[in-house]
Structures are given as C-alpha cells and as structure tokens.
Amino acid sequence: MAILSHTLGFPRVGLHRELKKAQESYWAGNISQQQLLETGRELRARHWQQQKDAGVDLLPVGDFAWYDHVLTTSLMLDNVPARHRSGANESDIDTLFRIGRGRAPTGEPAAAAEMTKWFNTNYHYMVPEFTLGQQFRLGWTQLLDEVDEALALGHRVKPVLLGPVSYLWLGKVKGEAFDRLSLLPALLPVYKQVLGELAKRGVDWVQIDEQALVLELPQAWREAYREAYQALQGQTKLLLTTYFDSIRHQLDIITALPVQGLHVDLVAGDDDLTELHRQLPAEWVLSAGVINGRNVWRADLQSWFEQLRPLLGKRELWLGSSCSLLHSPIDLSTETQLDEEVKSWFAFALQKCAELGLLRAALNAPDEANQARLGEYSAPIRARRHSSRVHNPEVKARLEKITAADSQRQQPYAARAALQRARFKLPAWPTTTIGSFPQTTEIRGLRLDFKRGRLDGGHYRTGISEHIKQAIVEQERLGLDVLVHGEAERNDMVEYFGEHLDGFVFTQNGWVQSYGSRCVKPPIIIGDISRPEAITIEWARYAQSLTAKPVKGMLTGPVTILCWSFPREDVSRKTIARQIALALRDEVADLEQAGIGVIQIDEPALREGLPLKHSAWQDYLTWAVEAFRLNAAVAQDDTQIHTHMCYCEFNDIMDSIAALDADVITIETSRSDMELLETFKEFDYPNEIGPGVYDIHSPNVPSEEWIVELLRKAAQRIPAERLWVNPDCGLKTRAWPETRQSLANMVTAARKLREEQP
C-alpha cells in the first residue's frame, strides 16, 4: 500500500499578500469585482501547483476564503443574517464582506457579525448566527466552483468541508434561546447535497473537518456525530479530520462512525500511533499529521520515520500536515536576511510540503539512500540543541531566583485605588483609548524608509515625534481623560517588542492571516529572552512632556507575546512566558522612573492560550496569571496598571481575570452587545473595567445614543464609579475621519452620563 501525502489547507494570502492588497483595493473602489475574483483564481492555481511540485499527492480545495472559511460555509448554507441581505435573496461576495466588515461596495451597511478566535490560534473566524426554526439551503457555491477549477487544471483534489457538528458548535444563538444542536436535521440535507455534487464530479475523498472532536464535548454533542454521519455516508469517502489536540477520549464515538479515514494531529496532541492503529477499523485510512502546520520549525523527519515505520504494510497510511498550513508563512527561500544557521532550523509552508514528500518517499522505499536523506535533513535540528544562540545562562539564573513575593503588589486594590484617585483626579466615566491611532501611509513610509536606510535616525525621530505630538493634540481637542502616544513607532504590538528583546528573530515575508485582509508577521522565539536596553521610555517620556493629563505607557504582555510569536519547542510555554515577564518587568520599573503613572500591559491573547481541553485549563491559567503579575507587580501602588483583552469570552475564567489584579481592565464587548457583562450577574469583579463601547473592526461610526445605551447597560452590572469609557480595541487599522467622529461621540456620551449623576 503506497503512502500518500496531503495538506489540510494552504495559506491564502499569497507570498506578497496579493489577496490582502486586492481585497483592500476592491473595498476602496480602485479595482472591479472581476479583478478581485481574478486575483483569487490566480492565487489558487499557483498554490495548487506549488503544493503538487513540492510533493503533495492530494491537493486541498475549498481551503481558500475571501474573508474566512467559516463565513464561506455560512454562505454555502445560506445562513445570512437578514441585516446583511440588503434586499437580495442570492448571496454574492459583497454579502460576505458585509457580514465580515459591516459594509461592502454594494448594499446597505449593517453591524458586522461577531468575530472570535479560531480554537487556540491567532486566526479569527466570523461567528455563525442561528435563530429558532432556521432553515438552510445550498446558496454560495464557491466550493463546487473551485473544485471545477482544480479538476480543469488536472489536479487530484481533496475538497475541504467544515463538518456540520463543528459548524453548529462554532455558532451562537440570536434572539429567542434554543439548543442550536436542534438545527442539525435541517442542516444535513444541504451537506448531503454538497457531497452529492462532489460525487458527480468524480471526487473520491472529502476532508470533512470536525475540530470540535478534540474538545471535551457534552454527551449530546458526541451523540450528534452519529446522527450526522449516518446521514452523510455513501456518496464519497470521508476523511474525518481533527486537529489542534488529541482525540483518544473520543475514539469510542469516532470508531463507530461510517467514515473511511481519520486524520489525527500528532504534533499538538499526544495520541499514540500504535494505539490508534489498534483501535481504528482495519479498512480505514490513518492520516498522520506529522508536519507542524502552526509553527516554523524544521521537522525531525528521522524521528517520524522511526515512529511510522512499524505501521508499514499493516494499514493504509497517509502523511499530512498537523493542521492547515494557513497558520504558517509561505516560503522560506525568500528570506534572504536570516542568518544561515538560524534559517536552517526553519520550514515554511512550501518547505513543509517538501518535508511530506521526503518522508513519504522514505517510507515508500525505506532503503539506505532515502534514510540517509532524512538524516541529512534532520542534522540542523540536532545542532540547534547545543547552539549558543539558544541558551543564555544569565536568564536561567534569574528564573531560578523568582519568589512568590515577586508577583505581589504591595497593597490590595482598594488601597491602591485610593492612592490613584488622589494622584490623577479623574472624572466619573473616565475616557481613554486602547493605545494605537491610525497608521497612516506617512507613518508606515517613515518606518520603512528608516528600516531600509533611506532615512537617518535623527530625521526618523523627528518624524515620529511629530506624529506623537499630533496624537496628543487630537486627544486634547477631543477631551479624552487618559491619553496615549499613538504607537506611531510600532509596526505590530508583538513584533515591536520582539525586535528589542534578545531571543527573537524576524522574517521579511513571514506573513500569516489574522482575519479578513489583516495579516501579521509573527516573531520567532529561538532562544532565551532578555532585555538588553529600555524599549518604550523615550517616546513615553516625550508624549508625557506634551500634556498635563496622564499618558499611558504601553506594553504587550508576556502571554500575548508568547501566543502571537512562533515559540520554541524545546522548552515549556510557561518558561518562555516567565522569561518575557522578567524582561518587561524591568520596562515597567523604567517607565515609572520616567514619570509615567499609568501603564497598560495588553493581554488580548490570554484566553487564546487556554488548552482546548477544559481539564487542562487550571495549570495554564496558574502560570499565565503569574507571568502577568510578575511583569506588573514591580509597580508602586499609586501607579495604575491597565490591561486590555479583546475577541474574548471570559465568563468561565473570571476568577483568573480577577487574579491578574490589574487596576483597570478594558475588554471587547461591542460586537456581542455587552453579552460579556452577563457574567457580572454571578461574579462581583473587584476592580475597574472599561467595556468597549464601539467596534473598531468596522469603519461604521457609532452614534452617541448607541454608546450611552451600552454604558447604561454596563452600569446595571458594574458600579458606575468603577466604569471606564473606551473603544473595544486599538485604532491602528482605522482612518482619522471616522476615528475623530467615533471618539467625539464617545466623549460626548461620557459627559452626558456624568451630567445625569446626582
């Protein structure tokens, strides 16, 4: 039985972010819809051919998305909220953009759908909305159209379909409460129709993604898999696909399903190959996810060869990426500025495809020559274990000296709050922003010219100073109470700090999609982390010199830097987080010395870092909270520590949020209509909180009345004297006109509420 290779998906955006540029040009009216669609066709054709050339046998089709693959599935099922239909019965690409962004070149603007994290990754999906008695039908035929494209190009295709149970799990009920699982019978006929259409096209295998199986599901949801797959059997072979964690706790359900194969993530999970082989039906394909789709490290092919070799000839075996390569940069060969030793440690999406081909060849013909190739390929991995670039004895020594007292503020919140009120004398309903202001073309050009040597340091600092001054003037004019310097010097909230810390390296083209057209270029943590010199002090001190109002020092927290970087795999995540916390602890002390009295330590990724299995949460939360406190606790009691979190649901981790002991927490609540605040019915949050009052991910300007309504709703759950008024996230991606108007409405709303107070 010859072993086949496949990937679960490929990056969509293009090596040079061609999709992002086309999307944004279309939204701005600079290119036609036809030109946008043509860009998508070109990217798909290129990516299929690149995977094939690298050694992938079965090509994923349906992994491409114009905004998000969950949103694509919603349109396929005609699950379009009424507010986004804009009078049209049939969906088109603008329908999709209205759901994702709140507006599109055609149709009426409407509130965008809620966006949240994709499992425990830094990718975001658009949350499906479900209503009581909802019906589904085959609407958007993107998957079928793209299968036709790939077949016309002569490719051996494996369509990718988000499974029905996971789709329901990922959504939310809107309106009258009901069990969304009750929609499964209405959903299955559309899935059957899609599978039937694929069968008509001669499709042999369909990859049906049921990522929810890695979770610890309620029994009703486990049983739903039986109902779903009994209904879907018989038209094509189904590869039940799981990833991001182990599935051994679900094998009793999985092995009873009428599918023909199972894909298991052997990188993120700890499933045992021998045990999987023993428990799976003998006729099933076992797809081994051995190439890490979520990180950039070269795979130890020699080790995987030894683990997989005992299965040769015993069952049909496929080799795959652990998950979609969506989470990986595209091509390492374009990185011309990386040190050659460090570069030899990495593999990006195309190199990962080649790894699959190399391992497949060795397993199909396990002769000495092929095994020697594996050994040669894996040599840099062994060399890295002893590299001086990786290990710093001083960092290890400092970690060993940490005590419990290092993560404790001097006094409890109530005593600190009294000192802070006396120091800052802020009004009721104090207003602030989250940190960043619009990153204009001028700002980006200034940074780029400096980075490429076209601008000297003096002129660069002068330029950045002018933008900081403009940000302070704008905020003073608007009447905000606690100001920010605007972060003109920062390209990305994680990359900026990584550039100033030892232990990180950076890429030129290592872009990955975050959501929609938003791409990020995560740093890579290659070794022990330390701070060689102060990072933010110069700009914070300058901004504070321009105003009598407090200006926040802005730091990215240790857990977020960890989660939004490609981490090391040779030490624990806890160890990495503590190293970052110690480095940034020194930055907090330096900010205080520079006269900064309000310091924000952003942790938007705190929930994202949670293990997928609830039983493993407490261990993670213990060290994540400790890392934040280790970072912050050096501050004096009259220094106000803020933190910010976004895209999150906190109802089930409120104890840990409170344990951070931040004086003020700002959170994303606008897209979910303050839904998060429902948790305060049960949980008496002790400190101050700023529920985000408008959605910065949409260009729509919130009305003063809308903001007042949200704040009144918040005041029903949290005492008004502990409420702050702020957007739900930074304003980096917005334009100045909408930013000014939105903030003006926000400040006016806060003043109105102050006037209403007795």
Swiss-Prot record:
Q: Which pathway, metabolic or otherwise, does it act in?
A: Amino-acid biosynthesis; L-methionine biosynthesis via de novo pathway; L-methionine from L-homocysteine (MetE route): step 1/1
Q: Which UniProt keywords apply?
A: Amino-acid biosynthesis, Metal-binding, Methionine biosynthesis, Methyltransferase, Repeat, Transferase, Zinc
Detail which positions bind L-homocysteine.
Answer: I434, G435, S436, E487, D602
Question: What EC number(s) does this enzyme carry?
Answer: 2.1.1.14
Annotated residues that bind 5-methyltetrahydropteroyltri-L-glutamate are located at: R17, E18, L19, K20, K117, R518, C519, W564, E608
The yes or no answer to whether the keyword Nuclease is present is no
| Catalytic residues in the record | H697 (proton donor)
Task: Return the cofactor note field.
Answer: Binds 1 zinc ion per subunit.
User: Which GO molecular function annotation, any one, does this entry have?
Assistant: 5-methyltetrahydropteroyltriglutamate-homocysteine S-methyltransferase activity
Needed cofactors, names only, are:
Zn(2+)
The reactions it catalyses are: 5-methyltetrahydropteroyltri-L-glutamate + L-homocysteine = tetrahydropteroyltri-L-glutamate + L-methionine
Q: Name one Pfam family in it.
A: Meth_synt_2
> Where is L-methionine annotated to bind?
I434, G435, S436, E487, D602
KW Secreted (keyword) present: no
Q: Which GO terms describe its biological process?
A: methionine biosynthetic process; methylation
Which residues are listed for Zn(2+) binding in this entry?
A: H644, C646, E668, C729
What does the UniProt function comment say about this protein?
Catalyzes the transfer of a methyl group from 5-methyltetrahydrofolate to homocysteine resulting in methionine formation.
Q: What protein family does this chain belong to? A: Belongs to the vitamin-B12 independent methionine synthase family.
PANTHER family, alphabetized: 5-METHYLTETRAHYDROPTEROYLTRIGLUTAMATE--HOMOCYSTEINE METHYLTRANSFERASE
Protein name per UniProt: 5-methyltetrahydropteroyltriglutamate--homocysteine methyltransferase
Q: Where does this protein come from, organism-wise?
A: Sodalis glossinidius (strain morsitans)
- Gene name, per UniProt, is metE
